[in-house]
Amino acid sequence: MGDFVVYRNLAPIDPRLPTLDEINKAQDKQLDAIPRKTSPDYAEILAFLLRDARTQDAPGTQIERVLFMGDTRMNDGTAFANICSAGNWSGIAFIGSEREDPLHTEIIEQNNTTLFLANRWNALDVFIEYCHQKDFHIDEHTVVLLDIDKTTLGARGRNDHVIDQVRVEAATQTVSNLLGGEFDIERFQHAYHYLNQTEFHPFTADNQDYLVYICLILGSGLIDLETLIDDVRSARVVSFSQFITQVDKKTSQLPPELRSIHEDIYSRFKQGDPTPFKAFRYNEYLASAAHMGHLGVDTPVRELLSQEILITHEVHQAALAWRAQGALLFGLSDKPDEASIPTGEMASRGNKPIHQIETEIVGAIS
């Protein structure tokens, strides 16, 4: 797919593709915020990008079909359906996740789209045969959308735990750097994992930037975890906005460096930035890159699966075949750009965007 890739900010890596501002102007839209993956606005922007990308490498060729590769029925399935609707295209999606129970597939048809759900990544062979049976042609009129996180890289149920571990590593490193000698790793990890539960998603908005910031404030001693949990459960604190506003009223009690970090995060939050904790996300990028391609080809597969973010063999092989048949490959990621693309300084040291980093290709193991 080269650089036909967009991360959360919908800023194409390939400079030939239009920017989000250019797309909004062409569509006569004024969006207050960058749309998320499951929104109809996201789908309309992506449909515009896909048509432009197809024109770049195959002038005069029209997109007629979408083949989507993902790992979550709700998020990826919704995004897929919206994209097909926005482009007025038919489509079929493979939604995979490795599980220990016996092989099972499920087919859900709705309007001009089909979801093919499987509990094995190697069920892609069954999916490809299903496409043949349904006369779903994969050719120059087809766009193959490759979800990057936990599909193309770090296959869900097989290797995705490394992506999660890397995020925790980055959060730990960030908070440790800021708290210095006051940092208590056990206390931090207890707070992080406790508040990362579904019960607290209405409070944290299931946003990792918010969660890591909350853990930073807890680590500073400004607020203790037990009090916060009680406040959330009793609805005295119902949102992250309420929490950070309360912290802002107590900044005089924070050390100067933490006060500066708080002010930066609070300012970005008020401006509507969904990833306001930049230091954390930059560390997440560096930690991710450090877990790609560093062990070597002679490393036992199980060790690779436990320590590296790997390319999913089945997805890789299928994508190569589809590209050879003329399909357009386009990568999607809902991961923040700051956690996926190096800063200028990082790039000057040889760092590359996540999708360009070489790492091992691993499939199912017996």
Per-range role (PLM):
Residues M1-R36, G96-E98, E106-T113, D135-I365:
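Alpha-helical substrate-recognition element adjacent to the catalytic core
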Residues D41-P59, V315-Q317:
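A short, acidic, amphipathic alpha-helical segment used as a generic capping/interface helix at domain edges
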Residues L49-A53, E64-D76, G331-S333:
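Glycine-rich anion-binding loop/nest that anchors nucleotide
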Residues Q62, C84-S85, I108-A118:
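Nucleo/cytoplasmic regulatory scaffolds in medium-to-very-large eukaryotic proteins
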Residues V66, G91-F94, L329-F330:
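Hydrophobic anchor at the start of a short beta-strand
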Residues F68-A86, H316, E338-G344:
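Acidic, divalent-metal-coordinating active-site segment for phosphoryl/phosphodiester hydrolysis
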Residues W89-L103:
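Glycine-rich phosphate-binding active-site loops on the catalytic face of alpha/beta enzymes
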Residues N112-I138:
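Short, basic/aromatic recognition patches
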